[in-house]
Structures are given as C-alpha cells and as structure tokens.
Amino acid sequence: MDFKGQVVMVTGGARGIGKAIAEGFARRGANLALADISLDSAEETAREMSGYGIKTMAVKLDVSKSEDVSKSFMDITKELGRIDVLINNAGITRDSLVLRMKEEDWDAVLDINLKGVFLCSKEAVKIMVKQRYGRIVNISSVVAFMGNPGQANYSASKAGIIGVTKTIAREYAGRGITVNAVAPGFISTAMTDALAENIKQDMLKSIPVGRFGSVDDVANAVIFLASQDNGYITGQVIHVNGGMYM
C-alpha cells in the first residue's frame, strides 16, 4: 500500500499505538501531521519520522477543545495542503469502580475519548467532502464490547466511538469517505511488561492465540482501512484482540 502524496493526521501520535501507526504510514510515504497534548513529544516523533524522507508537522492539540481542533486543522492544511486520512487515536483513562468514580473523571474521559472523535471528525469531513475523498479510522477498544471492571467511563467512551463511526460512515459514504474503527484487545506496552508474571499469565488465558498483541498488529489493521485499496468497507469495526472477543 502506497500513501505517497497523501497527508495523514494522527491524534495522540507521539507515543505508543499512535506512534506505531504514524511510523507505518511514514514507511509507506505519507506526509504526517502528529497532534498530541505534548508538543515536545510530538516534535520528537516528527523529527524521527522525517528520517523516512517525508514531510512532518507537530501540533499541540487538546482534542476536547473545539477552538484547538479548528485551529489545528487550519494549520495543517495551510502547511501540508490537505488531509486525506484522519486517525482518531487520542485517549486517556481515569480508572475507578463506579461507586468510587468521580464525576470529573467520567467527564474527562468522555471529553477526550468521545467528544474528541466528534470534533476532529467534523473538521476532517469538511476537508474531505471538498476533496471527494477521505479515510477516517477511529481507535475503539475490546472493552466497548465486553466491559471491564473499573473502566465504566473508558468503556462508555469506546462504545460511543462505534456509534459515531457508523453514523458518520452512513452520512458521507456517497462522498468518497470511508469511516471505520479498530478495537484492540490486550496490547503489549511498557505497562503490560511491568505486570507481575502471574497477572500476565491470567490475562493470556483469555486470549486464544496465546500472546499479547503488538502495536504493529493494530497499526497494520489501521493502515489497510486507511488505504485506497479500501473503498468498499465502511461503518465497520475490525477487532484486533487475538480472539479474546469473537
């Protein structure tokens, strides 16, 4: 899959899954706009990705603020000319059992994880409608379908992303825009690596393939959905979870 000449925007693109997604696009020739709450981290990742011989841009962005979002999209289109692909990856957690969860923790997670997808998608669609082409891929989670103790806010936000994905897909399918979601399961990160061995073994028992996913497993699914090869898949959720949810 070739993305030469295309501009890909990744929110939360400085670290973790977002960085892996960005690098996957960079290897395939896409120009990158990396939007992150940490400008320093975004700039560091942008410098790293520029080693692939592409144009890169780092943007400080709080996806829950409509003014920030509008300005970021304006800045990106001014600098890079267009936005062909939007990856809504920015997200946070504020874990607690329901009886202990503070209202501000509920609001914070929904604002970033769900409202952020709405605000960024709205700005992207404005651009993509004029281009009569666009790809939006939203990062959901297996907990949107299974739930997870201590994550009522996170599960709700990731489930909400599915509804937003399907609705925008229906609204703009006739304009050359596809909108899909990827729902990762347990992905190997620094946090999972630090878990006690007995906890990791218990988690692995729920995964039929017998291993944690990698950030590249997620990135590969995202890249296909965002490619020109995918013109007939829209409004769908691709599960990347090793079979823990079927």
Which functions belong to the PLM regions below?
Residues L97-V98, D105-L110, T192, M203:
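Substrate-binding pocket helix/loop in short-chain dehydrogenase/reductase
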Residues S141:
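Residue(s) in the substrate-gating loop at a strand-loop-helix junction
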Residues S121, S157, T165:
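Active-site helix of classical SDR
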Residues Y133, R211-V240, Y245:
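C-terminal substrate-recognition "lid" of short-chain dehydrogenase/reductases
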Residues L39, L61-K71, E103, D216-D217:
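The beta1-alpha1 cofactor-binding region of Rossmann-like NAD(H)/NADP(H)-dependent oxidoreductases
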Residues K126, R170-G174, G231:
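Alpha-helical segment proximal to the catalytic Tyr-Lys
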Residues R82, A173, T178, I233-G235:
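Short, small/polar-rich loop/turn modules that mediate ligand/substrate recognition or access, typified
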